[in-house]
Amino acid sequence: PSVSFQLPVIDFSDQNLKPGSSKWDEVTADVLKALEDYGCFEASFDKLSVELNRSVFEAMEDLFELPIPTKQRNVSSKLFHGYLCHNLYESLGINDANVLEKVNDFTQQLWPDHGNKSISETIHLFSEQLVELDLMVRRMIMESFGIEKYIDEHLNSTYYLTRLMKYTSPPDDDDDEETKLGLRSHTDKNIITILHQYQVDGLEVKTKDDKWIKVKPSQDSVLVMVGDSLCALLNGRLHSPYHRVIMTGKKTRYSTGLFSIPKTGVIIDSPEELVDKEHPRIFKPFEYTDFLHFFQTEAGR
């Protein structure tokens, strides 16, 4: 069973939120505490206006209404990056959606004749705003652990995947708990994930003491979550929380995710500043694609 619970809410809307300011230090302390306690927090961020959220929601409705063969043209050479469909879950993926040209490539896959200018612009603007939040959070985390000298190198070592997700409600006559699982319990493998859900709740996060909590962010806020690669980079100083999606009721659930992901060839290794007698090295250095492939094998499950 899960319980409703309010995760820490941290406001990133202040105009004075610049590195080095007292406001920055205050928010950084809140971010660190929330991530140490839960591995995630709710961020309120006024750049996600009501209009922008509505445009993204409408874009998702239009995209998912396309025929399956059309959606299957959303392909990528990267593992798990294109169109995915499993039970109640369906998803489209756009690499580097903070670059307008890349979003145009995505809409061109689905509408080869003319793309879709308004959907491209909406997804690009939305991704751009979330990237800004991702960069702030990662800078704060690195400052908190005294490894700010690696900030630029770290921020340049990643790229972004924007994922649009649709969860269909389970059939009426189905009481099987398993089928209500929109997405099974998992940790994210990347650096940071920023999730936004539209109108229908369903996301649950596991706490350190193994309790499932229902996460109900307000419409103008997002959930910021630590991924396994960040946990490894920080030598286990933060943890990546298990989370899942439970579908109850009759409404279709839409959500978006922005994932910061290590670029191909980047080796994830804890800086020596985070390794000492009390904190011996926990993870062998690894390359992200190898890590993903490992989780695809029996040993990794």
Swiss-Prot record:
Entry cofactors: Fe(2+)
Details of cofactor binding: Binds 1 Fe(2+) ion per subunit.
Span of domain Fe2OG dioxygenase: 158-262
Amino-acid positions noted as binding 2-oxoglutarate in the UniProt annotation, renumbered to this chain: R253
Identification of the protein by name: Probable 2-oxoglutarate-dependent dioxygenase AOP1
General function of this protein: Probable 2-oxoglutarate-dependent dioxygenase that may be involved in glucosinolates biosynthesis. May play a role in the production of aliphatic glucosinolates.
Annotated positions binding Fe cation: H186, D188, H243
Family: Belongs to the iron/ascorbate-dependent oxidoreductase family.
Sample GO molecular function, one term: metal ion binding
PROSITE patterns xrefs: FE2OG_OXY (PS51471)
Annotated EC: 1.14.11.-
Keyword vocabulary terms for this entry: Dioxygenase, Iron, Metal-binding, Oxidoreductase
Gene3D superfamilies (UniProt xref): B-lactam Antibiotic, Isopenicillin N Synthase, Chain
